[in-house]
Amino acid sequence: TDITVNKDTLSEENKKIYQSYYCGLCQTMKSQYGRRAQMALNYDMTFLIVLLTGLYEPDSVTRDGFVCSVHPTKKRTLRTNEITEYAAAMNILLAYYNLIDDWKDDKSLPKKTYAEMLKKDFEKAKKGYPVQAKAIEDYIARLTECEKSNDTNIDAVAGLTGEMLGVLFAWKQDEWQTDLKEFGCYMGKFIYIMDAYEDCLLYTS
């Protein structure tokens, strides 16, 4: 389950602003980690950028008329700030750990190959944000144990996702840290429960 916006409820101007943050994240991942990193791009971290930007109001840089290789016929607007770089690093950490976990579960060779391609980028992001990297690593290990033991306490299992996301949402150790951790925790629990619900629908249909 990705955290995305309901575009039907947004004005055209707000759609463009949201897209500019998404494009800004994409290009930041390219500049910080290379083209291969762009394949790991997701909307979850765009949501985090919008959330933290609205809260902290950092100075942003806007670039109009940008044309990317994915959409060569459309001119885009890029919007970036210091939070964009943080979100790019979180995107890399999450992608790498998920790829490794999927490889262990499914023995998917393409995922293993992509994880190996991201290894250098992962090490760079991990060095910059060791606390967040440890939170994701611990989360996957604890979730794996719960799955192996067939833990049926969905609230407790969903709480693992919440704890991890809470750490990622708490960008700084400041007056917003507690609120952001709590928000991320509830968001993470909701995401896990919705994923479980979608899986139930898939297997029962």
Stretch-by-stretch model annotation:
Residues Y203-T204:
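Conserved small/polar residues in nucleotide/adenosyl-binding loops
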Residues D2-C23:
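Low-complexity, Ser/Thr/Pro/Gly-enriched N-terminal "stalk/linker" regions
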Residues E198:
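Short active-site segment of divalent metal-dependent hydrolases/proteases
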Residues K16-D101, S149-Y186:
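Alpha-helical phosphate/pyrophosphate-handling elements in metalloenzyme active cores
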Residues T84-C146:
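Hydrophobic alpha-helical segments and helix pairs
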